[in-house]
Amino acid sequence: MAATLLDVCAVVPAAGFGRRMQTECPKQYLSIGNKTILEHSVHALLAHPRVTRVVIAISPGDHRFAQLPLANHPQITVVDGGNERADSVLAGLQAVAEAQWVLVHDAARPCLHQDDLARLLAISENSRVGGILASPVRDTMKRGESGKNAIAHTVERADLWHALTPQFFPRELLHDCLTRALNEGATITDEASALEYCGFHPALVEGRADNIKVTRPEDLALAEFYLTRTIHQEKA
């Protein structure tokens, strides 16, 4: 079977709370339209025919997920997440030990476009390392002085990218790199950083800048605008 036709599993770490949203409800359970942010994020993955299973890592005390239609979806598996994102991803990887390639997608990134997902999945044909969706930095970037709200210097943006999700890697490689990085006390901010720590260089697959992560209150209205626009375009 050609590599481009291999089935793919996805892991969605959804055990976080997201205190920057300034709400009592975890951000992944806030609603946009008639769905939660988590549902929008997961349905975007399931819309691709290669994605056959999604593992969602939730907090052990989470009582909200069971109320969603996702809880009874035949392609959804739920596992207990950990205190950190990497712990939740590892728990998800353990649940899909049979998978060769795995997507990892943010629970609060609901605006994923199918053409971006298709381009990312296509790299499995020729890559042994995988890659991530990313968007080139377009704004002027400043580095601040340590401990001060003052500019230290301007950062050259020519080779800077915003890391997005999904991120897409061979399952065994990602599992081994995450495990090693955690055991050695490395700072892991996303899955690609674990591979970087172990000496690998994942590909950058340019994706749309409107694939935003809902982190702050103002992001919710922006995500709603992007999703509404996409729905209208699909109906046109």
From Swiss-Prot:
PROSITE patterns: ISPD. Gene3D superfamilies: Spore Coat Polysaccharide Biosynthesis Protein SpsA, Chain A. Its EC number is 2.7.7.60. Pathway: Isoprenoid biosynthesis; isopentenyl diphosphate biosynthesis via DXP pathway; isopentenyl diphosphate from 1-deoxy-D-xylulose 5-phosphate: step 2/6. The keyword Nucleotidyltransferase applies. InterPro entries: IspD (IPR001228), IspD/TarI (IPR034683), IspD/TarI_cytidylyltransf_bact (IPR050088), ISPD_synthase_CS (IPR018294), Nucleotide-diphossugar_trans (IPR029044). GO terms for molecular function: 2-C-methyl-D-erythritol 4-phosphate cytidylyltransferase activity. Keywords: Isoprene biosynthesis, Nucleotidyltransferase, Transferase. It catalyses: 2-C-methyl-D-erythritol 4-phosphate + CTP + H(+) = 4-CDP-2-C-methyl-D-erythritol + diphosphate. The record marks 20, 27 as: Transition state stabilizer. The keyword Transit peptide does not apply. The record marks 157, 213 as: Positions MEP for the nucleophilic attack. One of its GO terms (biological process) is isopentenyl diphosphate biosynthetic process, methylerythritol 4-phosphate pathway. Catalyzes the formation of 4-diphosphocytidyl-2-C-methyl-D-erythritol from CTP and 2-C-methyl-D-erythritol 4-phosphate (MEP). Belongs to the IspD/TarI cytidylyltransferase family. IspD subfamily. This is 2-C-methyl-D-erythritol 4-phosphate cytidylyltransferase. It comes from Salmonella paratyphi B (strain ATCC BAA-1250 / SPB7). The lineage of its organism: Bacteria, Pseudomonadati, Pseudomonadota, Gammaproteobacteria, Enterobacterales.
